[in-house]
Curated annotation (Swiss-Prot):
An annotated Gene Ontology molecular function: L-cysteine desulfhydrase activity
InterPro entries per the UniProt record, alphabetical: Ser_deHydtase-like_asu, UPF0597
HAMAP family cross-referenced by the UniProt entry: UPF0597 (MF_01845)
Record Pfam families: SDH_alpha (PF03313)
Domain of life of the native organism: Bacteria
GO biological process: L-cysteine catabolic process to pyruvate
Protein name per Swiss-Prot or TrEMBL: UPF0597 protein PG_0909
Family the entry assigns: Belongs to the UPF0597 family.
Length: 433
């Protein structure tokens, strides 16, 4: 791989692996609210929020950092109060008590109306229209959580990238994908051969996500899956092993994040849980194996870049649980740390695809830590089987002899084949009494 290609991939990783405070879907809605509010001279007395079904699904039941509350209204209200879109996915970071009280008053005022946007829209679509008397402001985010394609104040356009967005492919594409289209060969080559000093920035993801795990273990967040694994019953029946330690690391960070703990994690491809799942199992196993600095860095890069590659094909949001993708990345990192060859790492990918493809996404919520645990367990099993040169073959289900084609099969199911499932899941979620 030439130096130019390496630099383009480094730029891609730095674009896709970024800090985020809170679940990225409600945070993205808060960002849109902050953008619109930043244009207003007065506090709005009416706020209309129109969302794609996938955004609504992922924002309904998740905790909002530092509030003790769940769901969209408080996230939107905080965005209005903060009114600082330059903070991007950290727009809810460092909320002051007086800001929270002001946001709660906005929620209590019932000025926020949330609905599904009708028509042919991207799976990641957020539109906010707010007004106060004769003053108004609007914002649209599309395709990427921070991609503000439109903003206007009193009908005067401030930002307009809608035509550019319309010209892009309607497939699961993004700016980063247009820069460089990855493959299994490229991901492996980059992770193995790029100078370590140029990719060791990935250790910041390990540091941030480990911190989230440590915060969680000191508290009682969500379903406390991580604490359960390390508790008396967990140790009695699950034991103490590399697997249980990586499960603890990963699930506890997810516990905290989904319950709204005020922690910043390093996301991957727009998802904090994907960043956690791509990072912490690999970090935990590297520590257990006493892997040196270089091997740890390369394993983390291999895992995270594999997630980016699969998400290029799948899209930012889908009916497929993101932990399937992220755990596939971590399985690659685990296999590498076990001494696996390129062929065996490919086996690990096929084993993952042959196992947990089809795990559906029913929104971001505390129980995501249980799905993450399932993904991490499968990642370990898939890597171990690969080391034994055991692999799901092309005679079995959707797996193909070619690794890239197997990934294509996985992503086409999540992107195209599960759309009816996605609709049914949202209908069930929104019709519960």
């Amino acid at each position: 791989m030439d130096t130019s290609t390496q630099q383009r991939i480094i730029s891609l990783i730095k674009k896709e692996v970024v800090p985020a405070t809170g679940c990225t879907e409600p945070v993205a809605v808060a960002l849109a609210a902050a953008q619109a509010a930043s244009l207003m001279e007065q506090r709005p007395d009416h706020v209309e929020v129109l969302l794609s079904p996938n955004i609504l699904k992922n924002a309904m039941g998740v905790g909002i950092p530092g509030t003790g509350m769940i769901g969209l209204p408080i996230a939107i209200a905080l965005g209005i109060v903060v009114a600082d879109p330059t903070k991007q996915l950290k727009v809810l970071d460092g909320i002051a008590p007086e800001q929270l009280e002001e946001a709660k008053k906005i929620v209590d005022g019932k000025i926020i109306q949330v609905a599904v946007k009708q028509g042919d829209i991207d799976k990641l679509y957020i539109e906010i229209n707010m007004s106060a008397g004769s003053e108004s402001a609007s914002t649209i985010i599309e395709k990427i959580h921070t991609n503000i394609i439109y903003a206007a104040h009193n009908g005067q356009v401030v930002i307009d990238g809608r035509h550019d967005a319309a010209d892009k492919s309607e497939s699961a594409s993004s700016e980063s994908e247009e820069e460089i289209a990855l493959s299994f060969e490229m991901v492996y080559d980059f992770a193995m051969n790029t100078p370590t000093e140029e990719i060791e920035f990935i250790l910041e993801a390990a540091r941030l996500n480990r911190h989230a795990s440590e915060v969680s273990m000191k508290g009682n967040y969500g379903h406390a899956v991580g604490r359960m694994i390390q508790g008396s019953l967990g140790r009695r029946y699950l034991g103490d092993s590399s697997l249980t330690r990586m499960l603890t690391y990963t699930s506890s960070a997810c516990d905290a994040r989904m319950d709204g703990a005020p922690v910043t994690v390093m996301s991957n491809s727009g998802s904090g849980n994907q960043g956690i799942t791509a990072t912490l199992p690999v970090l935990s196993f590297a520590e257990d194996e006493q892997a040196d600095h270089e091997r740890t860095v390369r394993a983390l890069v291999l895992s995270n870049l594999m997630v980016i590659y699969i998400k290029q094909k799948l899209g930012r949001l889908s009916a497929l649980c993101g932990c399937v993708v992220a755990a596939t990345g971590s399985s690659c990192g685990l296999c590498y740390l076990m001494g696996g060859t390129k062929e065996q790492i490919g086996f690990a990918i096929k084993n993952m695809i042959g196992n947990i493809t089809g795990m559906l996404c029913d929104g971001a919520k505390p129980s995501c830590s249980m799905k993450v645990s399932s993904g991490v367990s499968s990642a370990m099993f898939s890597a171990l089987l690969a080391m034994e040169k055991k692999v799901v073959t092309s005679n079995e289900g959707i797996v193909d002899d070619d690794v890239d084609q197997s990934i294509d099969n996985l992503t086409s199911i999540g992107r195209d084949g599960m759309n009816a499932t996605d609709t049914l899941v949202l209908n069930i979620m929104t019709s519960k009494k």
